[in-house]
Design a protein with these regions (language model features):
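Beta-propeller domain segments
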Residues: 27-67, 174, 191-194, 208-213, ...
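Asp-box/WD-like beta-propeller blade repeats and closely related beta-sheet repeat scaffolds
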Residues: 115, 124, 129, 141-180, ...
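Beta-rich catalytic cores
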Residues: 81, 99, 114, 121-124, ...
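Surface loop/turn motifs at the tips and blade-to-blade linkers of beta-strand repeat domains
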Residues: 74-79, 117-121, 162-169, 217-221, ...
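Blade-level signature of beta-propeller repeat domains, shared across WD40, Kelch, NHL, RCC1
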Residues: 374-398
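Conserved beta-propeller blade signature
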Residues: 92-95, 134-137, 184-188, 236-240, ...
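A short loop-to-beta-strand structural motif that recurs across blades of beta-propeller domains
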Residues: 102-105, 142-144, 204-206, 255, ...
């Protein structure tokens, strides 16, 4: 009997491996999670990332429209999947490339930009922050740092681990990274799903000290925020949030929020856009339990970069306005987003929400996707485009 069982064991194990392989082959992609049967025939799918950045001559910068007095120019190109930008103290612009797994340094050489790869083979690096000569990099599973990098661009220093007690989930696992007014390092931990009750470790904005100690949660119920900034005067944390998919093409709206104090819950997965209970997880709950959105920014617009303008080049009324870069939708028949929006906060009144730059979407065709902004020392504004692999510069002259 024992011999028979042992002889049969390889067959059983082989059959189990075959079943597992078949199950994996038949499993839907993660972006389809939560799709109702009524939308099973939908042809909507994420927009594929181009295999290479566009050549400078192929980038139609003239199609980007901005208010009168403003001008857009191509500042740098050939940066595959250009995402988050942060300045070094000596004038180096560091740029992340999530899909390429690289981090770049862009150096201005007398009006010409030279791009150098300073880190490669990383795990979906997105967030970058710089302080006291140190570049901090956020991957899916860890935060690292490169000490003295601006003096070693041609021979980058080894990456040192700052914090690595992070989930490894790929869905919404990429992170934004920024230093707050308190000197702490803030980052997001997205929900590991389209819609689910996430573990307590997910769907939040968190912070640590620069040495990786003192981890704590700042905001809860945040499905996926990959961009935030602090008000220059009040020091309150403002952030953009991507809402769930497959509830409809026109709902729910993405959000622009303010964490006026630590510990607020912003509704995920129970309430969407502040007034829609989730049909599955919202039963027995009320949207009044959660912090409402400051602005409903639109369905599936995918707001990423959030930045308060503090420069002096733009007109005086632009001071302390917020630029919100929207990467754009994939799950709407009529595309939305693909713009840089502007938010004017008004005491005692609803914020003003308007277009600042648009043109990456032409009819139903896209040629670029604005994802993040970063001010220059002279007050001009850089816009990163991860689809074209380019960075644009917006200037103003009366």
């Amino acid at each position: 009997m024992r011999r028979t069982i042992l002889a049969s064991l390889p067959l059983v194990l082989g059959f189990g491996v075959l079943l597992a392989a078949l199950a994996d082959a038949q499993a839907p992609p993660t972006w389809k999670q939560g799709q109702p049967s009524s939308m099973a025939d939908s042809t909507l799918a994420p927009i594929p990332q181009p295999p290479a950045p566009k050549a400078a001559a192929e980038i139609p910068v003239d199609k980007i429209k901005v208010p009168p007095g403003f001008k857009v120019s191509l500042w740098a190109s050939g940066i595959n999947n250009a995402r988050v930008m942060t300045w070094g103290e000596k004038g180096t612009l560091f740029v992340s490339s999530r899909t390429a797994g690289n981090v770049y340094a862009v150096v201005d050489k007398g009006g010409q930009r030279e791009v150098k790869t300073i880190a490669k083979g990383l795990n979906l690096p997105n967030g970058l922050a710089f302080k006291d000569g140190v570049l901090y990099i956020a991957e899916i599973h860890r935060i690292t740092k490169m000490v003295g990098i601006e003096d070693k661009l041609d021979a980058p220093p080894a990456m040192e681990v700052v914090y690595d007690i992070l989930p490894r989930d790929l869905p919404h696992g990429w992170k934004y990274l920024a230093f707050g007014p308190d000197g702490k390092l803030y980052f997001n931990i997205g929900a590991p799903c389209n819609i689910c009750i996430p573990p307590d470790t997910h769907a939040n904005i968190s912070r640590v000290n620069p040495d990786g100690t003192g981890f704590e949660y700042v905001a809860h119920g945040v499905r996926n925020s990959v961009g935030f900034d602090w008000h220059p005067v009040t020091k309150e944390l403002y952030f953009a949030t991507h809402a769930r998919d497959w509830l409809g093409e026109d709902v729910p709206s993405d959000r622009f929020d303010v964490a006026s104090k630590k510990g607020l819950h912003f509704g995920f997965p129970y309430c969407h856009q502040g007034d829609i209970l989730d049909p599955e997880f919202g039963r027995g709950r009320s949207c009044s339990e959660f912090a409402p959105p400051l602005i409903k920014t639109g369905p599936h617009v995918a707001g990423n970069g959030v930045e308060f303008y503090t420069g002096s080049m733009f007109p005086a009324e632009y001071k302390n306005r917020v630029f919100l870069a929207q990467r754009g939708s994939w799950n709407r028949t009529q595309k939305s987003g693909f713009k840089v929006m502007m938010v004017t906060l008004r005491t005692g009144d609803v914020p003003k929400y308007e277009v600042f730059a648009e043109g990456w979407l032409q009819g139903d065709q896209i040629w670029g996707r604005p994802v993040y902004t970063r001010q220059m020392k002279d007050g001009s504004l850089l816009i990163a485009d991860d689809y074209a692999g380019a960075i644009y510069r917006v200037t103003y002259q009366p």
